[in-house]
Amino acid sequence: QQFIEQEYAQIAWLRGESAETVCEHLEKAIAQTMPEAETQRKTGILSVEEYKLLLFRWEVCFGTDRERGEKELQELTEEIFQKNFERTERVKVIPYAALLKAKTSQDGKQDTYLKMITETALENLREEGKLLYMPEILKQYAKILEKENGDAEFIQLLRQERAGILE
């Protein structure tokens, strides 16, 4: 049932339906295995898929009247990094968390943290040979390095790598 509700939410999101509609499906999905999500997060018994679901809810609510807040995203990201997930599992959630973190780091705060999680995301993607999120992470990393006047050749290499993936 959780998977079905999550898929309904994703379809509604892709169709551009209201955040309210998408959130209704997400709340139903979350309730299937995380009826006490906040408590379960504190006890540390959530799976990667459950964290992805919580991140998706955060993304859907971002910029709406249902916004979950930057604090929740920070806490989710920190929890994900503290977990001892297998590499094959980490690659499913760390890049997503890094991309969402960039949405709240536009003002120049937490640049070091954003750089660290973006580097980790890129490393995980490369180690596992995954392309999902790779172009976005490469773009984000190049932007971060550019902002701090990083190595121009390396930044160009990141952009070329991204272009090669998108071709």
Where are these regions (language model features)?
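Short, well-structured alpha-helical interface segments that form or flank functional binding sites
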Residues: F3, T21-E24, R90-K92, M116, ...
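Alpha-helix C-terminal capping/termination sites
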Residues: L14-G16, C61-R66, K103-D107, E127, ...
